Amino acid sequence: MGEHRLARSAFLWGLSGIYLFAFVSLYVQIPGLYGREGILPAWKMLRFTGKGFWEQMKDSPSLLWFGPRLGLDTEMTMELICLLGALLSLGALLFSCLRDSLVFLLLWVFYLSLYQVGQVFLYFQWDSLLLETGFLAILVAPLHAMRWKTSVWSAHDGVTFWLTRWLLFRLMFASGVVKLTSRCPTWWGLTALTYHYETQCIPNPAAWYAHQLPVWLQKFSVVATFFIEIGVPWLFFLPFRRLRLFSFYSQVLLQILIIITGNYNFFNLLTIVLCCSMLDDQHIAFFQRHKKTQHKGGIATSAFSLRSLVSLLEIPIFGLLVFWTVKYFDLQINWDKHSLESRTAFTYHDFQQWLRTITFPSIWIAAASLGWEILKGMYRSASVRGFFWKLWSTLQWLMFSCAAAAMFTISLVPYTYMDFESNGQLWPEVHQMFNTVDRYQLVNSYGLFRRMTGVGGRPEVVVEGSFDRETWTEIEFMYKPGNISTIPTVIVPHQPRLDWQMWFAALSHHSHSPWFASFVYRLLQGNKDVIHLVQNDESLYPFHANPPTYIRAQQYKYWFTEVDQSGHMPKSWWRRRHVEEFFPAVFLDDPFLDNLLSQHGLKDKPPARRSLDAPIPFVLKLIRDFLHPLPAPLLLHSFIFGIFTIYFLQAMFGGVSRPSVAKQRHSMPPNEKKKQKPNSGQGESASSKSSGHGTDTVRRNKKNEKS
């Protein structure tokens, strides 16, 4: 594969945007979720236990411990961290000089600090994925402080960037595997998508239309999902460029389709950012028009022969993937029904045996791929000119290669969770290494949509309030389904964490969601910050004048409406049926409610509020008051619009800064030096015929210096 400079720059740029979305989205929800009188107050997670300050920092690494020293309570410290994180990530998004290792270290520390007190509202896989990706960015990003006066493309950059590809492999492969290891009948029956669109956490309007697609197409979509998540990731580590590009576009296609049909915050965008690890500079430069090549006969004869040989290997590999997909999912065209029929043609035992067989070979394949990147880095270090620079490059290569090997090693523990027999065969030292760093969320296990919920109807909790216990009024949420006539919302990349947890709460008894009792308690109190999570516009909240005397919750089953046989569109988006009472009617000082709150310490008296007269609390309050009326999706979409407007104006007026190719200190082989002697026109022609495999680095740099 070719160089990764532009791909790495795209990865760091995209991750900066993801951090911005994550910090801003969480910031607007802090008072209601984690405030002194929020649903799950964060101050409860930072109680001093008699241990020393640094010992508590070690047990729960978080910058929030420094809040009291700044005169801030826990809530305001969280707001400060979110604002600093948003400002820093916005700067990294707009200015390439800020896409530095130290900047990404700060962003990672900021998000980890929030994660430590986030409790159930931050325990999502994409939060763990962002932390792991963010830590890898510290290794991937350039450290300008160590590069002094020149921007040197370090020999180790390919090694550290490889870790993002390994993370993407683990994410996608595990997401496909767990769907089958869970024994979920909808995944095995290929009918999961006939339920998915209406049962996902927060559907959008496109989900309603996707739900109307014919069953045979839904089943084929499940087969395609398995193909992309289980089969295609094996191509990530093969030395064939076109197969990797195919992998890139297939993964991106899947993520875009999920974005179109669902509200999954920044998760799919983050996955697309990880897909940059499969790109090379030649492919990115093609779209940026860095290369205007006109290949002429004679010069490309040997390259053509090499491409032909590579194609002879690529075609059978791709053909095998298609063949196995057709065979094991029994794909057949039904000409009479004009459809494509499919079924699972293997058993759970067959799949478990296959998984057990390939788990360790997949590790060795990945290890060989990493080893190849390390060897390439060693060769580049040896090619650096000058004894001092060669020594410096070698030391960096050695340090980052060891770091990459360590990250790869500890990631094997969560990776092998999908097959516990393989997990048990790992060396005890590997488990010990993982347990040592587990608190920092450096590596995690993944596996999305393990089981398809909502078979037989989407469970939904509807909260109701009353003044007299006779007349009940439903409390509508901004994002989750409630009123059957309300159109589903589009809120990407925002994640309304209360609405998401309401979806999880509906899947089981209320006792499995202790936070729900606290939520009801705050509504009975008329807590403005918690109400703001339910309705940003208080006038739409039915009890904005006076809090309700009683609150209860009912459980319903929801289904998408369908187009009738005549093709007429229904008037409502949903239909629903009452199932049972989810939470009994309670009031303030109700013994049942008090008992639930006391069991989980949710009625403890908060610490005294700190003064707002100090400069930092005063500024934080001003910012909060200014942003409070804005809905979170509007705020995030404004950021997106503003950023792209800036880039558009820069492009229009010629001020856009493209990712540059760093100057090299690598010496050229003798045959390369001979090719530099002809005139400049010939030199440019030669450099334009880059094969994308890193053989013409110096010539490409010469061309960039001229332009």
Swiss-Prot record:
Signal sequence coordinates: none
Intracellular or extracellular location(s): Endoplasmic reticulum membrane
Disulfides per UniProt: none
Compositional bias (Low complexity): 680-694
Glycosylation sites: N483
Biased composition (Basic and acidic residues): 696-707
Keywords: Endoplasmic reticulum, Glycoprotein, Membrane, Transmembrane, Transmembrane helix
InterPro entries: LMF (IPR009613)
Keyword Flavoprotein found: no
GO biological process, one term: protein maturation
Entry membrane topology: Multi-pass membrane protein
Membrane spanning residue stretches: 10-30, 78-98, 102-122, 126-146, 158-178, 220-240, 256-276, 309-329, 358-378, 395-415, 634-654
Sequence segments annotated as region (Disordered): 661-707
CC annotations in GO: endoplasmic reticulum membrane
The family this protein is said to belong to: Belongs to the lipase maturation factor family.
Protein task: Involved in the maturation of specific proteins in the endoplasmic reticulum.
Name of the protein: Lipase maturation factor 2
Originating organism: Xenopus laevis
